[in-house]
C-alpha cells in the first residue's frame, strides 16, 4: 500500500463567530514547522492552504480575497525557505456558492485575487478543486457546467486565461450524496467519472469525499459506517475500479 498524503492546513473553529479563524503568521510558521518535523512517506509534501475560503464560515466570518491572497503568498514563501520539498495547493473554491453576504461566487473570488495580485497564482504548484455533481451533490455524471464533476475544467480554463499556463489539478473533494434515487446507480456513476472525466490527463489525484463521516451530517457520503463496516458507497467505488 502506497500512501501519498495531501495535508490541508486548518485553524480553530470559533463558536462565537461560527467560523474558522484566520491564521496569523506565527500560527502558520508553527504549522509548517510541525509538518516539517514529521516523517513523510513521500519526498514531496503536498499541502493545501486552507479550505473553501469563498465562504465566510471558512475565513473568520468574512469573505476577503485580498487577505487570503496575502496568506497564500506567505505560506508559499515560507514553505520554500528551506529545502523541504513542499508542493503548494490553494484552498479549493466552493463552485456552487453564489454571490451573497456570506459567500462569493468562485470565479468572482478568484478574479478579485488576481486583481489584487496578478502574480498570485504563481505561488501555487498544483491546482486544487472541489468538483461535485451539483445541485444537491446528486446530479448525473454526464452533466456539464462549473457545478458538475467537470468543475475542475472551468478552474483550469480560468487559470489559463489569466496566466497562460497549464496547471495540473488534484480533485480533493468529489462524489455523491447517496439517496433513495441514486443508490442503485452509484457504481455506474463512478465508472463513468473514472472513464470519461477523471481520466483527463491534467488530473493527477482524485480523493472522493469521504472515507468515514458516520455518524454525522456526512454519513450519506461515507465509505464506512459508524460501525466501521463498508457502505454502498464503498462497494460502488470498488466495483467501478474493477471496471477500468
Task: Show which residues each predicted segment covers.
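Histidine-bearing beta->alpha loop at or near hydrolase active sites
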Residues: 51, 176, 213
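Eukaryote-biased recognition of C-terminal alpha-helical segments
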Residues: 205, 209-213
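Substrate-engagement module of ASCE P-loop NTPases
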Residues: 198
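Noncatalytic carbohydrate-binding groove/subsite architecture in carbohydrate-active enzymes
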Residues: 3-17, 21-37, 45, 64-191, ...
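Aromatic- and kink-enriched transmembrane "portal" helix at the membrane-lumen/periplasm boundary
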Residues: 53-58
